[in-house]
Amino acid sequence: MVRNSEITLEQIFKEGRINLENDDYNCVICSFPLFDGLQCKRGHGACKSCWEKIIGENGKKECHSCRISIKSLDDLSKNLYLEKEIFKQKVACLNNGREKFGNTLVIKSDGGCKRQDIPIEKLLHHIKNECGYLLIDCKYSRDCKYYKQISLEQHQNECQFMSIHCPALCGKKDSRMNINKHLETPNSCKPLISINNSNNSNGNGNGIDDESIIKLSNSIVEIQKSYQNQIKKIKENSESEIAALKDSLYYSKSRIKNLEDEVEELKDRFSTLESMINKLDDSATSRSGTILINGWKMKLKSLDVGHSIVEEQFYIGTNRFYIRIYPFGDSYDNQGYVTVKLGRIDGEEYHLDIGLKVSIKGFDNKKKVLLSYYPGDIAHNIDQLVETWETSKEFKMILHFKVDLKPKIK
């Protein structure tokens, strides 16, 4: 734990009390954080203490990395961005009740501050004003053990070196240690009470002798001691309960933070799933594609009216469709046309929006292309003229199609 309220952030860094996992924030020479880092003209950094050794009487007076000449600290500059980033880093309170021995982290039994997320720039303010676990040197004696800041009142009630007045009202003022001895020594404490012996040689005018007064004083002292012990126990119990409440609050805050992170993660997952569902919805009501046919000449030798050159099957949701291309027409009624037929194999009844675009290259003569939907919802000719394939030229056909399903109104 930190001792002495006059401690500075520079001391904390130089003593190695702060460890930063990112090596970019640590001095490349001493490995301590770059609290007061400086850099050469080429951007190579180190902490001020290491630079002072470099330019010292026995130093090399050159950059440890690029060997550029460094004669004084005036040849160096600060990296303000890096300094700002370092001070943003969050660390645990130094009064966390943990100490490191070698590579072993030991959790001390007296506990400590639970804060784990303090920005370095606010660390000193937290230690001095918020934490309560700062170790304070007793101002009454160097021989007295230091105490935690939150235990100031308890320490003042128990410190053996603190000056107090005798509770028996004798007027004596001394350290608590000496006052206790004073009270335990017979006949050493004489209360400041006027005793009148005019009517009674062994007592005062009211018939109360000196011995009774001393007994009364001692009784008062015992009552005060008992009261102080009760107060001490109440404070100890209260401190224990407060510490437990602080622990519970800390872990509750930590749990809330974890839950908030989980909520954000669930939001991201929901957004992803929503996007996937939208895509599935699109695929369930629409389908588009392209059919490319090369080298018809060889394919057409064995074909006649009613024979298709290609068939493509596809799904829109749970509905299965096909597209067939008949180079000589799908029937003798359509002989002389290239028939492109869209048909539904199975699925529910829908109205269809059909988009077909045909591009045929390599013909000499003209003939029309018939686009039809089976079993007869759509059948029409298009104005596009295509060339016949009775020549020796090779040609290709590109068919772009798009089908949208719409619920059928009954």
Swiss-Prot record:
Main subcellular location: cytoplasm
Record keyword Metal-binding present: yes
Record keywords: Coiled coil, Cytoplasm, Metal-binding, Repeat, Zinc, Zinc-finger
Domain of life: Eukaryota
InterPro entries: Cep57_MT-bd_dom (IPR024957), TRAF-like (IPR008974), Znf_RING/FYVE/PHD (IPR013083)
Compartments where found: Cytoplasm
GO molecular function: microtubule binding; zinc ion binding
UniProt keyword Metal-binding, yes or no: yes
Coiled-coil ranges per UniProt: 216-284
ZnF bounds (TRAF-type): 81-154, 154-213
Cellular component terms per the entry's GO annotation: cytoplasm
Reported function: Probable adapter protein and signal transducer that links members of the tumor necrosis factor receptor family to different signaling pathways by association with the receptor cytoplasmic domain and kinases.
Record family assignment: Belongs to the TNF receptor-associated factor family.
Domain-level remarks: The MATH/TRAF domain binds to receptor cytoplasmic domains.
Protein name, entry field: TNF receptor-associated factor family protein DDB_G0279745
